[in-house]
Amino acid sequence: MKFAIESVSKCSGRLGTLNVKNAFSNVSISTPALVLHAKGGSIPFLSREVLQYLTAETPIMQHSLTNTDHMEEAVRACDEGISSFVGHKESISLLVLKDPAEQCKPSFHEKDFVPIFSRSGRKNFTSERYMQLVEAFKPTVFVPLFDGDTDLESSKKRLQKSLDRTEKFVEQCVEAHRKSANLKESNLIGPVVGGYNLKLRSASVKFLEQFKNDLEGYMIAGLHSNGLSATELKESNLVEVVSHTCQSLPTDKVRFMFGAFSPRIILKLVAQGIDVFDTSFAYLKTQQNRALTFSFDVNDKNVDSRETELDIRDPRWAEEFTGFVESCSCLACTKHTKAYAHHLYNTREMLAPIILMMHNLHHYFEFFKAIRKHVSEDTLDQLVEHLQKQKDVPLFDEKSVDVTKADPMDFRDSATKKLKV
């Protein structure tokens, strides 16, 4: 894995090119960029064929230990790695410990292992056990075992223990990586921990310096508990820590930061020098039955009336026969309407989350194209201001719907929602 910086702007972050290859493909992506958040080896709600409508480029797929550990025996038997096993052999696989879309469960941490909660319950992973799984998965890129279960509320004592454990785990995983014949083509990225404590962040970066020849990049972790917690982060606290950390990291290595950050937070992180994010935000919005509609065209004259999202459960869309976003060219917006999406939700059709996910991913990737354009022109502050003018929409409360004004053609009982006999 190689990272090349193309330009560094004064106030808008940096542009770069990340080149990654595996046995089947050689992928080059422009940064700031996105990796595809996967669950169980697949993009949620989308088949491989539908995914090809979204992007013709070879994807970088983010696999998490929490929803793939049950595959270990089968992947080991396959002997071609997790990408081939899940039917995306040409994709670049990136293995992380925990799913950024799932809230971390509080748990007791021991010095010798990291608890992982998967579909089969809690499992305690030591460095040795973790590297056995990594050898079976043969990921293109992976992070060593680390203790990053910290957030703004974590005590200094907890943060210190997180750093101490992470240092031990990283040493053991790096040593195992050096000795492994199966992982010679796998790239290691270093986890930077320390919560919101700047001194511990600096200590974490300093510790990783000794492995600079082993690490192809860095991942800033330990700032939130995954899931929706990332959408609720306080901007000022987050930016201070990320800015401090990025200033300490080598400039020639790629920087990852995963989590369901809001578009406004994403822009702040890009400005600080983060290069790669994931699509868990688009997935969580799909789970909430919401379509992303925020504008990233700074020439949009109607920005003051724009809403950042729309909720397909809202009855006001029942007779809106236009796509989610007027100018959107995704398959969902060109072939379907808000009214149809609202109908699909009401009838609990499986197609509803599919077209939502198609649109949300497309919209999010287009957003990052706009980000790269503004970084190249050093005008990211214009995009920040543009987003701040738009209105956030609260979650729709289905209990607020007046059942006395129900659709006369709805043959379901208003109380039970079952078909009337």
Curated annotation (Swiss-Prot):
ATP-binding as UniProt keyword: no
GO molecular function: metal ion binding; tRNA-guanosine(34) queuine transglycosylase activity
Main location (coarse class): cytoplasm
Entry cofactors: Zn(2+)
InterPro entries: QTRTD1, Queuine_tRNA-ribosyltrfase, TGT-like_sf, tRNA_ribo_trans-like
Entry's Gene Ontology BP terms: tRNA-guanine transglycosylation
Keyword tRNA processing: yes
Cofactor annotation comment: Binds 1 zinc ion per subunit.
Highest taxon, organism lineage: Eukaryota
Subcellular location(s) of the protein: Cytoplasm
One term under GO cellular component: cytoplasm
Positions that bind Zn(2+): C328, C330, C333, H359
Family from the record: Belongs to the queuine tRNA-ribosyltransferase family. QTRT2 subfamily.
Record-linked HAMAP family: QTRT2
Subunit structure: Heterodimer of a catalytic subunit and an accessory subunit.
Protein's job: Non-catalytic subunit of the queuine tRNA-ribosyltransferase (TGT) that catalyzes the base-exchange of a guanine (G) residue with queuine (Q) at position 34 (anticodon wobble position) in tRNAs with GU(N) anticodons (tRNA-Asp, -Asn, -His and -Tyr), resulting in the hypermodified nucleoside queuosine (7-(((4,5-cis-dihydroxy-2-cyclopenten-1-yl)amino)methyl)-7-deazaguanosine).
PANTHER family noted in UniProt: QUEUINE TRNA-RIBOSYLTRANSFERASE ACCESSORY SUBUNIT 2 (PTHR46064:SF1)
Name recorded for this polypeptide: Queuine tRNA-ribosyltransferase accessory subunit 2
